[in-house]
């Protein structure tokens, strides 16, 4: 059993691959930000004083498709969940509502 990353009398937060640690399955609600399945490459381009600056970040593990998201939701079942994702990929089966967050 893994210890929560943070816990108080109202909430327990776990940090890690939820397919390896299953303590979260006993929770009342699931709030998760799984890999979106968009193949994010972690490269950004900005211009500073007329010079193009490219920055690279590591790839996100499991972001090639939505299999991580789909595995988690299959384990979770029909219980309440808030799942962050991308409009670029099909919604998971059983979605009742969606909220658009325009950053």
Model segments located where?
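Core catalytic lobe of class I
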Residues: 4-103
């Amino acid at each position: 059993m893994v210890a929560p990353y943070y816990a108080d009398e109202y909430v327990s937060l776990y940090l890690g691959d939820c397919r390896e640690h299953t303590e979260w399955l006993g929770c009342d609600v699931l709030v998760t930000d799984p890999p979106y399945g968009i193949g994010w490459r972690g490269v950004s381009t900005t211009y500073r004083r007329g010079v193009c600056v490219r920055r690279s970040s590591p790839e996100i593990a499991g972001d090639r498709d939505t299999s991580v998201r789909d595995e988690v939701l299959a384990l979770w079942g029909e219980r309440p969940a808030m799942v962050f994702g991308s409009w670029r990929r099909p919604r998971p089966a059983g979605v009742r509502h969606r909220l658009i967050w325009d950053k």
